[in-house]
Amino acid sequence: MRLRPMTSMMFWLPVATSLLAPAAMADDTSSPFDLFAERCLDQGPRYDRTVAFAKEREWAALAEDITLGIVPLNEPTAFDGWIVQTGGDKPFEALVVAKASVGKKAVESCSMAFAGIGAEQFELFLTTTRHAIPSGQQSGAVRSRKFFTIVRDGSKEAVTLDLPLYPNGADEVVASIVAEQQIEN
């Protein structure tokens, strides 16, 4: 599975976190990892369900160029992104979903971008609570992209964390999961 280069995400996340006006507040006090697990990991990416959920919540749309900078797939056939939280006492959060074809398989992705959170703690939660198995790493000048595999019901799902090389506890983290599209009845 081919993922997008790190450079676009490295550029757009700081822009998004510094320029966006306050948006609809998230209505829970869950940790960033719990939010990623609830919205992306627990049931896998669900593009249509997530789009409907975001519309119901009336989340503000994320700019298309920023959304594309967060999408982990090359050449998505559909994508949407929203500002879930910014301002107030909670850190910035964005949610992005996409669909694409990889070979002959239809896949979906779900990503969340956070600012002002602990990157090391986020990674620890992923490996300990979801038994994510490390499968590779790519490092740039200031950021690292770590790849993991989660096996669920006999299917492998790819998880990617985009983290700072030198975390300080108030970090920008982008977490993504890519899985084969599940057809809901």
What are these language model-derived features?
Residues 21-23:
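N-terminal signal peptide c-region/cleavage motif recognized by signal peptidases
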Residues 83-147:
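Long, charged/polar, surface-exposed segments that mediate recognition or autoinhibition
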Residues 1-6:
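N-terminal secretory signal peptides that target proteins for export/translocation
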Residues 27-94, 98-99:
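N-terminal leader/targeting segments
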Residues 74-81, 101-102, 106-108, 113, ...:
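Compact alpha-helical subdomains of small soluble proteins
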Residues 9-19:
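Bacterial N-terminal signal peptides
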Residues 137-185:
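Glycine-rich, aromatic-bearing surface loops/beta-hairpins
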